């Protein structure tokens, strides 16, 4: 276990203002080989159609907390998964304590002193807390069986050291999300790793629990650990991080001491470009209020969301991961019914508890995860496109007007420029962009008045994105009211008449198009 504490800031850092407009990579501040517990050099990683990391570099010094900042899709999580052995890089190298290593999976990374606390908790719900922490490392008695007394004892000792008040014999499934998070942290600490990666560790914690976590982090820092801390919360950066690095669009932008910058400096580094004209939007007349939402909420998820949506309007919804954006869409469409608040359509109160009820009121919902909740991957285009209309105008006397439905699906496929051998091609064989077009076509066949789009261009190429943007703008021009949720700031700013911003389950503001820019939206999204 290390005992040395390395002093804060790195002399010779570039000024934050100079980095704010940078589009390339600048070298991390100089530090000796003995100082670095972890270093990444020129690492790149691509997925089909997407460059997630483009030759990035990154260093973590002993006895420091190094925050990683960037918008959704900046490459932070991909880099951390490479460091933790989950992904294999396409290029570049990783050095641990100055020595190049090849990580052959997460267990290999653990053996080399790198532990990661994932945002998505990875505990076994039907095992006890102690069994989860020491899985694969259980103490054995002289007969080679698990020594349960020793297991409880060493868990209790670990918890005492970390001031965690949880019974080691409790089944994980009975714990709150916050308690599970503390168990995950304790498990990572139990490996006595040199590097701990924490991905949004406070997302489920109360203020009191955050204070407790920060006390643990400071304790680990004093022991000489290198801690990588991924967060969207700027106040946490200034409270706990010694230094931070910013990533943008898969590129490394720069590293600075936390004490040398302001909140606005960081936002400018994360934003880095003027994009307001990248998505030209047609000016169309805005009509009457179609959808009115007042104090909408789902217990424990989001609360007090209020807004109006007019015919021909595109209302963008921005916010960081976990802000509640998608949950609002699910409540509106009856996937997870609202537990409080009121929904009105054309001024009349409606109760929506199922997607079928939402569809009867003229609503359509394109979900954010096309593979898990959108596409029927082993079915063909026709089956996927007709899925939402089989109880609609194509059914008469309990018979489906199959010929008419097929003609309309063919016409929709042509209009959306879906590239495929034909309607009987399995949708899993199509590109992401063409899959998305099929799903949009599915909902357009229902002739919706209110169209909810959750991440409409996620994971598709630039050309397909442009086509979908043109389509959404054209639908608004025909009077469709569009609610568009997106993690891509250029898309939100370029396509929206107004932008609603959410943070941690509550609405923090609605900004008119003329007043919206990335700095203002990011400020509202991190309040």
Swiss-Prot record:
**An MF annotation (GO) of this entry:** ABC-type D-ribose transporter activity
- What is the predominant subcellular site recorded for this chain? membrane
Catalysed reaction equations from the record: D-ribose(out) + ATP + H2O = D-ribose(in) + ADP + phosphate + H(+); D-galactose(out) + ATP + H2O = D-galactose(in) + ADP + phosphate + H(+)
* Protein's cellular compartments: Cell inner membrane
Organism, as annotated:
Burkholderia lata (strain ATCC 17760 / DSM 23089 / LMG 22485 / NCIMB 9086 / R18194 / 383)
Q: What EC number(s) is this enzyme filed under?
A: 7.5.2.11, 7.5.2.7
What InterPro entries does the annotation carry?
Answer: AAA+_ATPase, ABC_carbohydrate_import_ATPase, ABC_transporter-like_ATP-bd, ABC_transporter-like_CS, P-loop_NTPase
Residues forming the ABC transporter domain are 38-274, 284-523
UniProt feature, compositional bias: Low complexity: 12-31
Q: Which UniProt keywords apply?
A: ATP-binding, Cell inner membrane, Cell membrane, Membrane, Nucleotide-binding, Repeat, Sugar transport, Translocase, Transport
Please indicate which superkingdom the organism of origin belongs to: Bacteria
Q: How does the protein associate with the membrane?
A: Peripheral membrane protein
- Give the residues the record marks as binding ATP: 70-77
Instruction: Give the region (Disordered) as residue ranges.
Output: 1-31
Family, as annotated: Belongs to the ABC transporter superfamily. Carbohydrate importer 2 (CUT2) (TC 3.A.1.2) family.
* Name of protein: Putative ribose/galactose/methyl galactoside import ATP-binding protein 2
Q: What does this protein do?
A: Part of an ABC transporter complex involved in carbohydrate import. Could be involved in ribose, galactose and/or methyl galactoside import. Responsible for energy coupling to the transport system.
């Amino acid at each position: 276990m290390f005992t040395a504490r390395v002093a804060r800031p790195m002399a010779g850092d570039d000024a934050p203002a100079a980095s704010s407009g940078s589009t390339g990579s600048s070298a991390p501040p100089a530090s000796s080989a003995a100082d670095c517990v972890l270093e990444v050099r020129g690492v790149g990683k691509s997925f089909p159609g997407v460059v997630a990391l483009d030759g990035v570099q990154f260093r973590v010094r002993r006895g420091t907390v190094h925050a990683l900042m960037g918008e959704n899709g900046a490459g932070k999580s991909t880099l951390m998964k490479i460091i933790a052995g989950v992904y294999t890089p396409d290029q570049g190298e990783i050095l641990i304590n100055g020595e190049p290593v090849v990580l052959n999976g997460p267990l290999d990374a653990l053996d080399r002193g790198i532990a990661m606390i994932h945002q998505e908790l990875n505990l076994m719900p039907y095992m006890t807390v102690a069994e989860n922490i020491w899985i694969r490392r259980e103490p054995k008695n002289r007969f080679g069986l698990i020594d349960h007394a020793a297991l409880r004892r060493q868990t209790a000792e670990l918890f005492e050291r970390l001031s965690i008040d949880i019974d080691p014999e409790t089944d994980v499934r009975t714990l709150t999300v916050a308690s599970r998070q503390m168990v995950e942290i304790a498990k990572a600490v139990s490996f006595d790793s040199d590097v701990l990666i924490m991905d949004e560790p406070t997302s489920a914690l109360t203020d009191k629990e955050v204070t407790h976590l920060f006390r643990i982090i400071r304790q680990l820092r004093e022991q000489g650990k290198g801690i990588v801390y991924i967060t969207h919360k700027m106040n946490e950066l200034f409270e706990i991080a010694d230094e931070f690095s910013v990533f943008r669009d898969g590129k490394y932008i720069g590293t600075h001491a936390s004490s040398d910058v302001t909140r606005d400096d960081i936002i400018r580094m994360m934003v880095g470009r003027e994009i307001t004209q990248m998505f030209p939007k047609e000016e169309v007349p805005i009509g009457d209020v179609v959808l009115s939402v007042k104090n909408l909420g789902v217990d424990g998820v989001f609360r007090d969301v209020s807004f109006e949506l007019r015919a021909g309007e595109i209302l963008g919804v921005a916010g960081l991961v976990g802000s509640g954006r998608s949950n609002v869409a699910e409540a509106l469409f009856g996937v997870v019914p609202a537990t409080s608040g009121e929904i009105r359509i054309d001024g009349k109160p409606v109760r929506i508890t199922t997607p079928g009820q939402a569809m009867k009121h003229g609503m359509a919902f394109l979900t954010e995860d096309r593979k898990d909740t959108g596409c029927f991957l082993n079915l063909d285009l026709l089956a996927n496109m007709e899925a939402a209309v089989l109880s609609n105008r194509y059914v008469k006397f309990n018979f489906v007007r199959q010929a008419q439905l097929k003609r309309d699906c063919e016409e929709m496929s042509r209009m959306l420029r879906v590239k495929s051998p034909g309607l009987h091609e399995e949708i899993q064989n199509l590109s992401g962009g063409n899959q998305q077009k099929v799903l949009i076509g599915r909902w357009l066949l229902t002739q919706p008045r209110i169209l909810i789009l959750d991440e409409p261009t996620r994971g598709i190429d630039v050309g397909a994105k442009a086509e979908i943007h043109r389509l959404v703008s054209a639908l608004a021009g025909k009077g469709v009211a569009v609610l568009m949720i997106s993690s891509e700031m250029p898309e939100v700013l370029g396509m929206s008449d107004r932008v609603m911003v959410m943070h941690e389950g509550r609405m923090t503001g609605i900004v008119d198009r003329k007043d919206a820019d990335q700095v203002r939206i990011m400020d509202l999204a991190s309040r």
